UniProtKB/Swiss-Prot annotation:
Lipid group attachment sites (N-myristoyl glycine): 2
Chain residue ranges for the region called Interaction with membrane phosphatidylinositol 4,5-bisphosphate and RNA: 14-33
Site keyed Cleavage: positions: 132-133, 363-364, 377-378, 432-433, 440-441, 488-489
Organism in which the protein naturally occurs: Human immunodeficiency virus type 1 group M subtype B (isolate CDC-451) (HIV-1)
Residues covered by region (Interaction with Gp41): 7-31
CCHC-type ZnF: 390-407, 411-428
Locus of motif Nuclear export signal: 16-22
Name of this protein: Gag-Pol polyprotein
Pfam families per record: Gag_p17 (PF00540), Gag_p24_C (PF19317), RVP (PF00077), zf-CCHC (PF00098)
Amino acid sequence: MGARASVLSGGELDRWEKIRLRPGGKKQYRLKHIVWASRKLERFAVNPGLLETSKGCRQILGQLQPSLQTGSEELRSLYNTVATLYCVHQRIEVRDTKEALDKIEEEQNKSKKKAQQAAADTGNSSQVSQNYPIVQNLQGQMVHQAISPRTLNAWVKVIEEKAFSPEVIPMFAALSEGATPQDLNTMLNTVGGHQAAMQMLKETINEEAAEWDRLHPVHAGPIAPGQMREPRGSDIAGTTSTLQEQIGWMTNNPPTPVGEIYKRWIILGLNKIVRMYSPISILDIRQGPKEPFRDYVDRFYKTLRAEQASQEVKNWMTETLLVQNANPDCKTILKALGPAATLEEMMTACQGVGGPGHKARVLAEAMSQVTNSATIMMQRGNFRRQGKTVKCFNCGKEGHIARNCKAPRKKGCWKCGREGHQMKDCTERQANFLREDLAFPQGKAREFSSEQTRANSPTRGELQVWGRDNNSLSEAGAERQGTVSFSFPQITLWQRPIVTIKIGGQLKEALLDTGADDTVLEEINLPGRWKPKMIGGIGGFIKVRQYDEV
């Protein structure tokens, strides 16, 4: 790292660290950005030592600039870093990366005007290529330098490692900058495997060459002295043209950039191959429930590079699908950030989502909300007790169960009243609420008949319930409603008799249910208002009419 970071002196380093990454942003350039740029240049087979001088930075910018339109975000970041470093070497005061790019563009326009003026003064064309691999020798002739083995080796390694993944296209564009059709064919011939893909590439080149011949027909008549023939599609592909003809077309006035045309055809074919090797659509890229957001973004942009769409469409895909296809946890965070959030802000906000720390934090927040809501309910008096009051089967009192009852144990079954077995072993389906040994002045208790037992069924007609808990009848009311002929005693749970009562001027048999504080009557019509009610016990539920203040 020390060798890479030594490209700047002390004063230059101070100016470098004052420049912001984006206008109005807080982050500034650091040494790590220079180290990162050096490593990326090594990947592109470019000497990272060129970063030490402004001239070297200018050469790197000239090599990277033609690939910006089809390059990846990584390539653009590298170009921005080198442009900012060039301004630092030239002592050009800039505050952020955008100003550095504006300064570079301004200098390029000035140099282009100077070159045009010089070409007009000397009578030479301003479009003459001075870039590698076509260079001008000492005699002023344009000569070709063969593509270096280092460049070919870098290209072969990319094909072997990436196997026509989306990043192969910008890599090819960077390595083939300024190359002639012969150089491009040399690069294609070095690919040993993937012959099916290479055959697809040849078919695409033949189609584009035929389209070129259709759009550029040969002019009739002889060629003027000193003029070159017009290139055909096969000439551009390098199959029917010599190296000297290719150099002549590229350096002619006006020039015919056969190398750039052929490279555009090759990139078109590579796009088809990448689409075949990467059949996944951008619509299918979704974040897994436990997948880190960073890995999801890597997969998203890798697939986006293989999409054949304009930059406007890709920008729309990024703004819409990146948030829409995230998992629920990340989607909640991204929607809270808003549509103007940058990718850096998204990755920072979603860092750690899905891990144990995030889950513990979400669980703690949920428990806190539940606790607060329960506290508010209890403070407002909305808290209702969920458990029912227990009742003892032995003595009939509430507040304890038979196991803890201090009263003498009742003999027999607590369900049917017979001796010889306990309640847990009782086979009686319907509870027998009546005891045969009870004697009352109004009549003897008896068991339900089969007809009365069916009255407990939900399908049976409605019964009448006389509520006794909220009636304190006056004598006048008693005369109007009818007087009960019996004063009900306090009867325990085991003593539920059927007695004869007089209500509404009618004599009826009624079941006294002291536990529920209700009197149940059957087949009687009473005047006044009533409301529907469901009552039930061990035998089931029945529908009744409830009359109050009877």
